[in-house]
A protein has these predicted regions:
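Mid-domain alpha/beta scaffold segments of enzyme catalytic cores
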Residues: 1-257
């Protein structure tokens, strides 16, 4: 049983074979639960629709930093309403992205802070997108008291110091495809160091496919390859890692089955 804590199965890349991808993940790779993440008004809607269709798929709703420029003040009320949906178990993804120059940094920060405040109001954990913005992400999480709700730094790309700062605020560390890349020294180091009770597995599919599918469309079933790599790095059976990380996901997102 594996919990893939970050998917985008509503992405157009899956329009031709979405049901088959989900079936394959369940039956061939042992993925029992998936958290599908919406990141703007369009993808939030389709993410919830997908979660309503499958009892083992949940949804997160939020505004991605690269889409922050599209955020309107009325969207906060929209997110607040959706936070009460029974299949919505987290807010996000939210955060900062300094790699893609699509939204000004000050706009990203404003939208990020608004979502953290909403998460504290509705008491849902948050999913953090952090690209080339580690220090600013941690600073905002600290200043906005994100420790009150916790969450996950998805597709974690920071170093040990950033990891420790996140752990101090009740956050989990999400690891995906990059940990399988041959020269990915830092992700492999983090995979060894993160405490077992704070580790989550993810794919970010259709993006960031693990080896040997790097550069191709990622699938949620490939989270099994991520689990195998991390289990090898930590020197434990993959079944044990799957159990540990699934328990962690259930605890963070308050999912009971």
């Amino acid at each position: 049983m594996i919990f893939d804590t970050h998917t985008h199965l509503n992405d157009k890349q899956f329009d031709q074979d979405r049901e088959e991808v989900i079936r394959r993940a369940k039956e061939e790779y042992g993925v029992s639960w998936m958290l599908n993440v919406g990141f703007n008004r369009e993808t939030i809607k389709s993410s919830i629709e997908l979660a309503e269709k499958y009892d083992f798929i949940y949804s997160a709703v939020g505004w991605h930093p690269t889409d922050a420029i599209t955020y309107q003040e009325e969207d906060l009320a929209y997110l607040r309403k959706l936070a009460a949906h029974p299949k919505v178990i987290a807010l996000g993804e939210m955060g900062l992205d300094y790699h893609w120059d699509t939204s000004p940094k000050e706009v990203q920060a404003h939208v990020f802070k608004e979502q953290i405040r909403l998460a504290r109001e509705v008491q849902l954990p948050i999913i953090i997108h952090d690209r080339d913005a580690h220090e600013d992400v941690i600073r905002i999480l600290q200043s906005e008291h994100a420790e009150e709700v916790g969450g996950v730094l998805h597709c974690f790309g920071g170093d040990e110091a950033i990891m420790e700062a996140a752990l101090e605020m009740n956050f989990y560390i999400g690891l995906g495809g990059p940990v399988t890349f041959k020269n990915a020294k830092l992700p492999k180091e983090i995979a060894r160091l993160v405490p077992e009770d704070r580790l989550l597995l993810e794919t970010d599919c259709p993006y960031l496919a693990p080896h040997p599918y790097r550069g191709k469309r990622n699938e949620t079933g490939y989270v099994r390859l991520v689990a195998e790599q991390i289990a090898e790095l930590r020197g434990i059976p993959v079944e044990e890692l799957a159990r540990i990380t699934t328990d962690n996901a259930m605890r963070l997102f308050r999912v009971s089955v």
